A protein has these predicted regions:
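Terminal amphipathic alpha-helical/low-complexity segments used for targeting or macromolecular assembly
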Residues: 1-7, 12-13, 18-19, 55, ...
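Structural signal for interior beta-strand "rungs" in well-ordered beta-sheet cores
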Residues: 3-183, 187-188
Length: 256
């Protein structure tokens, strides 16, 4: 049974699962689907097009599936998909998709800290930690288990690899490959995210191989030559393949 405050508004066409808690001054719009066991504290707004899983907690001021901040948007029907077990803190805003991709996606088991923004058509993986006041422009992609510290600004269309860590206050105009620390101004490669990799259970052998991959990529002539040297020299584990595929498919170029 859902617990809905008499001071909340739930549109009659909204679809709610079971055991949800909806606090005072929450607003649930039409064309909304919500799973089970979600907690919406006071003053949470769930806009049209929201597709929310289960076991999420939304803190005061969170606004989900807002109208995209895109002048090309013409009111097309799009969605914002949120997975399970997310903690979405105070004043987080997540825009729904546009005609470009049709939906914004937030995976599962993420912590989105207060006052951060997820732009239209972004695709966020799972296991992410994104710090206070970090802003993601439209169509940003972040792979699983990345960490973005506070006040990070990410340019539209950027791709951030899994297990990467971006230092606080950084500006990211280019793609950030997996497993690394990115920092300084302008943004640069600052070594591997060794502490994060160890915490996630990576072995010394895996970490050493990732290190050697970047050593060859960044120190062997051109990037193309570095990729060729990696393929000739190192075993093609899933970590190495992930790095090479990320670099080869980068649309904005990678930080160096």
């Amino acid at each position: 049974m859902n617990q809905i405050s008499p001071l909340a508004y739930v549109h009659p066409e909204a679809k709610l699962g079971d055991n949800n808690i909806i606090g005072p001054f929450c607003y649930i719009d039409r064309d909304v689907e919500i799973g089970d066991n979600n907690v919406m504290q006071n003053s949470v707004t769930i806009h049209v097009g929201s597709r929310i899983g289960s076991n999420n907690e939304f803190f005061p001021g969170a606004s989900i599936s807002t109208k995209p901040q895109d002048l090309k948007f013409r009111g097309e029907e799009t969605t914002c998909v949120v997975g399970d077990n997310n903690s979405i803190r105070e004043n987080v805003t997540i825009s729904r998709g546009t005609a470009s991709k049709g939906k914004t996606v937030v995976g599962s088991n993420n912590l989105l800290m207060e006052n951060m923004h997820v732009g239209h058509d972004c695709v966020l993986g799972s296991g992410l930690i994104i710090g206070n006041s970090t802003k993601l422009a439209g169509e940003v992609v972040i792979d699983d288990n990345a960490i973005l510290s506070g006040c990070v600004l990410v340019h539209q269309f950027c791709h951030i690899g899994g297990y990467a860590m971006v230092q606080g206050g950084s500006r990211s105009p280019m793609d950030i490959p997996p497993y690394i620390i990115a920092g300084r101004d302008p943004l640069k490669y600052c070594g591997l995210n060794i502490v994060g990799l160890r915490r996630r259970g990576f072995s010394k052998e895996q970490i050493d191989l990732i290190h050697n991959t970047y050593r060859l990529l960044y120190n062997t002539g051109t990037l193309k030559e570095g990729i060729e040297e990696v393929r000739k020299t190192l075993p093609m584990t899933k970590e190495v393949e992930y790095i090479l595929n990320f670099v080869e498919t980068s649309q904005r170029g990678i930080i160096r």
